[in-house]
């Protein structure tokens, strides 16, 4: 499984910039495209934005430590951009629509587990 975990998330001008723990290889990064879809990893408390190329998926993981900045970006309407490596940026289209949908779905939904529900409420609750 191809995946990258966001190590740092910061607000810059009109964007939220995600930097990964490890860079994606240049050839792979050039092929990846945004899918406009997100998943939830309730075991590891992460939101996962899905990228893809012609052959496989790449999971861009946003762990709980990044959620405060995600909420700030969501409230200000700043688009999320991921640095896959020093040469490749990718815009995570439809990120906040997907994130809002997942947040709404997690609230009161035992399928995600009490810990995940509580963590999401603490980070994104009003």
Curated annotation (Swiss-Prot):
Question: What Pfam families does this protein's entry cite?
Answer: UPF0738
Which domain of life does this protein belong to?
A: Bacteria
Name the family.
Belongs to the UPF0738 family.
Q: What is this protein called?
A: UPF0738 protein BH2850
